[in-house]
Structure formats: C-alpha cells, structure tokens
C-alpha cells in the first residue's frame, strides 16, 4: 500500500498523462476526479463555461470518491490551468475533503497552454492552509517528460 495519492482532473488528457507518469514513478495510488456532468469538448464552449464557473466560485458535483484519504500522508493535486487557477472539479474535491488534507504534504501540478502555474500554488495553499505545500510543477500541454518529472520529484525529496 502506498502512502502517496495522485489526485487529478483532466479535460483534454494532458493532466491525465502527467498524473500517470507521476503515479508510475512513485508507485503511488491514483484518483481521477470526474464531474457528474462532463464539460463540452469544443474549446470555446469549455473556455466560456470555465470562466463563468470560476468567476462564481462554482463547485460542480463530482462522482463519489471510493478511497480513504486518511491513509495517505502525501497527496499530489493536479489540474489544468483554467483562468490561472484550478479547474472547478478540483475545487470541489478540495472543499469536500479539506479535513482529510490537514497535516499532509500537498503537492500541486498543472498543465497549461501558456499561462504557467498562474496562481494555482497560492490558491491551493489558501484552500489547504493546514497542509504542508511543496513545490509543484507546471507543464506546457503534456510536454513534461519522464526525466523532467523525475528531476522535480527528486528536487522536492519525494523520490
């Protein structure tokens, strides 16, 4: 049993790819956050919906999580960068599980189309104020290689 969990939401597959690499390198458990209602696939439609949801601090319903978060001491949280912050399904996950994140190492990672991390690390630090937030990694689309991720995990003393 691993004491590390990789939690992520992915719309286009980029964040999923990054999450899978982290999972494989750490031999960790992995949990995909899935919204009850899928986002549109058309780029302009998802951009407009995400912008509206984020401006309203909206927390969409997500599918039930069948995992005991208490057994993990380290939790990676991955999201696409949507309007410089986490995707709403990840906000829902964090808000529903704040008590289970207390005193844990929380490590953000994201994929983006040019906006870098935006303010994702600061947002996660604010939402997980009683957690130890470690340095995250932002990847353009899904360009983070196995080597890039290995170097990052080594740098933050996870490997």
Predicted regions mapped to residue ranges:
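Redox-cofactor binding/interface segments in oxidoreductases and associated redox assembly factors
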Residues: 77-78, 108
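Generic anion/oxyanion-binding catalytic loop in active/binding sites
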Residues: 4, 79, 138
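Short, glycine-/small-residue-rich phosphate/pyrophosphate-handling segment
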Residues: 107-144
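N-terminal beta1-alpha1-beta2 submodule of the flavodoxin-like/Rossmannoid cofactor-binding fold
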Residues: 1-75, 84-87, 92-96, 102, ...
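Solvent-exposed loop/turn segments at secondary-structure junctions
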Residues: 12, 37, 82-84, 113-116, ...
């Amino acid at each position: 049993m691993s004491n590390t969990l990789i939690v992520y939401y992915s719309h286009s597959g980029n964040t999923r790819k990054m999450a899978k690499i982290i999972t494989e390198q750490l031999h960790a458990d992995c949990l995909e956050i899935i919204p009850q209602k899928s986002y549109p696939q058309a780029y302009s439609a998802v951009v407009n919906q995400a912008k509206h949801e984020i401006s309203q601090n909206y927390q969409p319903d997500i599918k039930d999580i069948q995992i005991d978060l208490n057994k993990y001491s380290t939790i990676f949280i991955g999201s696409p960068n949507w309007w410089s912050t986490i995707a709403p399904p990840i906000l829902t996950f964090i808000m529903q599980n704040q008590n289970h994140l207390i005193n844990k190492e929380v490590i953000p990672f994201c994929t983006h189309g040019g906006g870098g991390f935006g303010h994702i690390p600061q947002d996660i630090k604010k939402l997980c104020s009683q957690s130890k937030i470690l340095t995250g990694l932002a990847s353009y689309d899904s360009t983070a290689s196995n080597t890039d991720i290995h170097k990052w995990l080594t740098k933050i003393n996870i490997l």
